[in-house]
């Protein structure tokens, strides 16, 4: 298998178009998109969040995901055989927010709507769309959890994290399914992280 590296800014339509054009030139088709770009924002009260920060999070987490899905759908509809699979990276924050996370939480709720709309609108074209909601995978984004993170009750506590390889395995299993089968939503998280009952 050949790897193709294409630097891109998912928040810019032209950059996304170039990314998918390069993909089509290199491989001739697109079978799976893992829609994974995302970022957070500083944990501050709502009234202190700069609108520029809000827009940056929305541009990456929602607009970027839309632009990548849109480009993938164009390819998947046009190719023969038609179809493919889109896996959107949601978050457990699509179900239960953390304190002071309005921008991130709002975009992850919106990703769920994006996933459902793609599933409905693209079903006639053999395009399956699912979402994986990840909680506390051990990445750079979650390193701060080892030192303690703000909880809904105002306390700060360490939270367990899981090996990100387990997430990769879950995504690979979703991607491997035949197109007549779909995991619509999957939640994967560190077993003892505060999620059920959070808040």
Which residue stretches match the model-derived regions?
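The beta1-alpha1 cofactor-binding region of Rossmann-like NAD(H)/NADP(H)-dependent oxidoreductases
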Residues: 7-19, 51
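Substrate-binding pocket helix/loop in short-chain dehydrogenase/reductase
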Residues: 44-46, 53-58
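Active-site helix of classical SDR
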Residues: 69, 107
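Alpha-helical segment proximal to the catalytic Tyr-Lys
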Residues: 74, 120-121
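Residue(s) in the substrate-gating loop at a strand-loop-helix junction
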Residues: 91
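C-terminal helical subdomain
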Residues: 131-132, 151-197
């Amino acid at each position: 298998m050949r790897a193709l590296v294409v630097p891109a800014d998912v928040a810019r339509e032209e950059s996304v178009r170039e990314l998918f054009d390069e993909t089509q030139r290199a491989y001739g088709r697109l079978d799976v998109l893992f829609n994974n770009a995302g970022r957070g924002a500083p944990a501050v009260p709502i009234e202190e969040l700069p609108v520029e920060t809000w827009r940056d999070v929305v541009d990456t987490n929602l607009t970027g995901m839309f632009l990548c899905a849109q480009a993938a759908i164009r390819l998947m509809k046009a190719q023969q055989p038609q179809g493919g699979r889109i896996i959107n990276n949601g978050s457990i924050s699509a179900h239960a927010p953390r304190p002071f996370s309005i921008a991130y939480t709002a975009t992850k709720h919106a990703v769920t709507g994006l996933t459902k709309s793609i599933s409905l609108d693209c079903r006639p074209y053999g395009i399956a769309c699912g979402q994986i909601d990840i909680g506390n995978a051990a990445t750079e984004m979650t390193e701060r959890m080892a030192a303690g993170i703000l909880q809904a009750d105002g306390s700060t506590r360490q939270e367990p994290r899981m090996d990100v390889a387990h997430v990769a395995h879950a995504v690979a299993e979703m991607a491997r399914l035949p197109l007549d089968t779909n995991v619509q939503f999957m939640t994967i998280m560190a077993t003892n992280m505060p999620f059920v009952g959070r808040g």
